[in-house]
């Protein structure tokens, strides 16, 4: 069945969230080393399969392939496609789409030396707990705390021709073209949807949210960067994943 609506969504802190935000009744969405790491709300578990039947569900996440594959989706809600590595790697039924990957590789091939050099120098910092190149596409650093992430970002802000983003204690360096907006544009070219809905919570999501016919955000933090007439802010006293899925189903109409 051709689905006329494309629902492109961030994952962490949008559809699922960590143990720090867990509430009674939440369902485990991810195990890591045997421990419950991520969670869905009960309403998300109920609504996500309905949404998956009515719209094309397309996660777009900074997660690596391995991190994405740890997610335990509700029955009937496993996405057929997902864009990992900030949109650089398309998984179709769990397998890498080689055409998509090759196109992404062309965007980053000339930057591989800079990526490796940046990784080497960032890894040497005492306030960086871990750093790596994700799927050959971008550099990621996990710092000891939020203040360390800000220091790390300040130290390398002008060091490479990349887009740098800070999210909590994490810092990302994305080469040109490795952003969620570019990924969504490429996906829309493939799927030709009539309408695009997007949900996200961080500055990394802004390029994707700007391309939406309707964008959904958890609060007003990102609103200055988005077209207000095409952006919905989560209602008070409603958990963001539930707000997102209620909105998607309302936009899709009767199933």
Region spans (language model):
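Glycine-rich, phosphate-binding/catalytic loops in enzymes
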Residues: 23-27, 75-77, 215
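Active-site phosphate-binding/coordination module
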Residues: 38-122
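Asp-based, Mg2+/Mn2+-dependent phosphohydrolase catalytic module
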Residues: 219-255
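The start of beta-strands in P-loop NTPase/AAA+ ATPase cores
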Residues: 5-7, 80, 196
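Active-site neighborhood of HAD-like aspartate-dependent phosphohydrolases
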Residues: 2-7, 11-59
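Short, well-ordered beta-strand core segments
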Residues: 57, 82, 196, 215-216
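Short glycine-/acidic-enriched loop or helix-start segments at secondary-structure transitions
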Residues: 18-19, 68-71, 93-94, 207-208, ...
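Conserved acidic, metal-coordinating active-site core of Asp-based
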Residues: 118-211, 221-222, 226
């Amino acid at each position: 069945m051709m689905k006329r609506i494309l629902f492109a969504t961030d994952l962490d802190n949008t559809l699922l969230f960590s143990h720090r935000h867990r509430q009674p009744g939440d369902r485990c969405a991810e195990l890591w080393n045997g421990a419950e790491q991520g969670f869905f709300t009960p309403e998300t578990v109920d609504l996500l399969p309905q949404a998956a039947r009515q719209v094309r569900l397309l996660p777009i996440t900074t997660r690596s392939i391995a991190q994405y594959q740890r997610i335990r989706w509700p029955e009937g809600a496993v996405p057929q496609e997902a864009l990992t590595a900030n949109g650089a790697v398309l998984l179709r039924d769990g397998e890498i789409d080689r055409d998509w990957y090759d196109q992404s590789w062309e965007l980053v091939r000339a930057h591989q030396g800079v990526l490796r050099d940046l990784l080497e120098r960032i890894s040497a910092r005492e306030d960086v707990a871990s750093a790596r190149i994700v799927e050959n596409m971008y550099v990621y650093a996990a710092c000891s705390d939020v203040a360390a992430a800000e220091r790390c970002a300040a130290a390398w802000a002008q060091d490479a021709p990349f887009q740098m983003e800070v999210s909590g204690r994490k810092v990302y360096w994305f080469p040109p073209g490795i952003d969620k907006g570019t990924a969504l544009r490429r996906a829309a070219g493939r799927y030709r949807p009539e309408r695009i809905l997007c949900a996200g919570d961080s500055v990394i999501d802004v390029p994707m949210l700007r391309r939406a016919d309707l964008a959904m955000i958890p609060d007003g933090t990102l609103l200055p960067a988005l077209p207000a007439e095409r952006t919905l802010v989560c209602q008070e006293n409603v958990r963001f994943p539930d707000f997102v899925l209620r909105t998607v189903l309302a936009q899709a109409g009767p199933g």
